[in-house]
Amino acid sequence: MKLSKKNEALNIIEPSYLASLSSLLWVALYYLPIGGALLRLILPLPIILLHLRRGTRTAFEGLILQFLLLFILMGPIRGTLFLFPYGILAFWLGWSWFKEKNWWLSWSVGFILGTLGFFIRVFALSTLVGDNLWIIITRASFGLIDKFVGLLNLPFSPSIIIIQLVAILLIIFQEMVYVLTIHILAYSLFPRLNSNIPDPPKMINGFVDIGL
């Protein structure tokens, strides 16, 4: 009976605590001018940890709690943006590792979710600020292509299609690295919190060893 009551209490306390922690990380990421890269890495970890410790139902409750908290604190657009991709990605990775799915599945679906979430954020923020932020991304893509062409001294002028394609490929690559880094970070940290994720594939053991 005591054990049952303890579990019930933890099922209430842990979602509240970890959802609040994740919400604070999101607020810090949104408003603080420094530490963005580190905050992005640790932002999904509280919900993932909740999933591993308490299961899918409790993790979903924690995600809903975080959504409601941020919706109240930051408004409908800024509060909802944490879902894309951080909230959804955290739930997916937590579910994958809770079900002991292999890294290839959790990573591949994870970076797809991350890429889709990036485009949703660009659209939402463009609506919020009243400017097309995709233009800024394509300009950055053109600048990268221009530097590469100039470095190799190539007689090449990229078309708008190539510029857009390079921008999309860069976003996909960024999300691939980001999700893989979360895997390595979780594999390193979670055993110290009495939670484990599946072992990495042999092919990427070298990256994991570097991360550890």
Positions of PLM-derived features:
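Interfacial aromatic-anchored transmembrane helix boundaries in multi-pass membrane proteins
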Residues: 27-36, 66-97
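Residue-level hotspots within the lipid-embedded alpha helices of multi-pass solute transporters
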Residues: 37, 82-83, 171-176
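Hydrophobic alpha-helical transmembrane segments
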Residues: 12-17, 60-64, 80, 84, ...
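Membrane-embedded alpha-helical hairpins and interfacial helices in multi-pass inner-membrane proteins
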Residues: 109-196, 201, 205
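Hydrophobic transmembrane alpha-helices
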Residues: 2-65
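Membrane-helix interfacial "entry" motifs
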Residues: 3, 7, 11, 71-78, ...
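Short helix-perturbing small/polar motifs within transmembrane alpha-helices
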Residues: 83-126
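Membrane-water interface at transmembrane helix exits
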Residues: 30, 52, 70, 74, ...
